[in-house]
Amino acid sequence: MLLICTVIFVALLFTYTNGFHDTANSIATVVGTKVLTPRQAILLAAATNLAGAFFGAAVAKTITSGLVDSNYISSGVLVCALSGSIGWNLLTWYYGLPSSSSHALVGGLCGAALASAHGNWAAIKWIELKTKTVQVLDPATHEMVANKITEKSGILYKVVIPMVSSPVVGFVGGFLFMLLLYMLLRRWKPVTVNRVFGKAQLLSSGYMGFSHGMSDATKCMGIITLALVAGTKAGMFDHFPSWLSFFSVPESADPKNQIIPKWVTALCALTMAAGTAAGGWRIIKTLSHKMVKLQPVHGFAAETTGATVLAIAASYGMPVSTTHVITTSIMGVGCAKRLSALKMDVVKRILWAWVLTLPATAGVGYLLVRGCQAFQWLP
């Protein structure tokens, strides 16, 4: 039970660091355009992150049963996975690098699971294809007929492909949306554009915060639920009194049907909001000031694009990176303005942080578990 409580504590600590680390992603543009002060923007982000965390548990379900084999997961393994992720978050936060908390979590989880399985690569669910039969309406006969569909999941479809495609979609979407706005607003006076989009950016910033909560807070829910599932399978809660039965969570064969306890949802939502309120000025400065000079219309375009990509990915249970999406959206908007508006030295630092996140956190998670095994703290 002590280990379960430790996992919950460390998972909430990860969520808290994710909150202040990723606060920058949801408010950088509204601060960079000077529509809100950092303090006002952080309070807005905290409120919208809290609201978003209560909507959509698809990402949590993917983390719980869609990435690694739960037979190789224990509370100790999860502590190692989370420790590596938290360390990476703090390191990149200290140096002001907008790396991915999502990929840090996935990397740490995969590395720890691999070590727990003593190098058995089957511990990681690389590709999963499930065929299911659904009833659809035949337009010719107007009758319901059986139709087979294939659902794709696993690391490749839920992490790797979205990891590559979401930044591209963010960049292209930001670029095209900004070009469209330029065409529509070409006869407007700059003063009018700034006034209108200064107000509109309050909505887009709130939308971004909501999408961030919907995507990132649910990852913590997945980790805690995974620990509870592992404890339930091990019979850890069999002798608990009835008033503690909420700790027992059975595993579902289908990740889409995995139960996420409501108390876990509430706990993670509040922790994410608290971490968001703590803020992350170092990364805000990188995104809002160093990459490209932003006006309210640019901030609106970047936030709307990024939030939409995040919301769609979250609805499909894909733990994509908020950082990747909003950063590339800002880059796309900057390139629509003029290519020279983009500062490539900053972009290179960000790219290096992206490339290193998955292997670095996977390596740390792996080594931590192997170290615990060497001291016989883990089987």
Where do the protein language model's features map onto the residues?
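Multi-pass alpha-helical transmembrane bundle typical of ion/small-solute transporters
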Residues: M1-P379
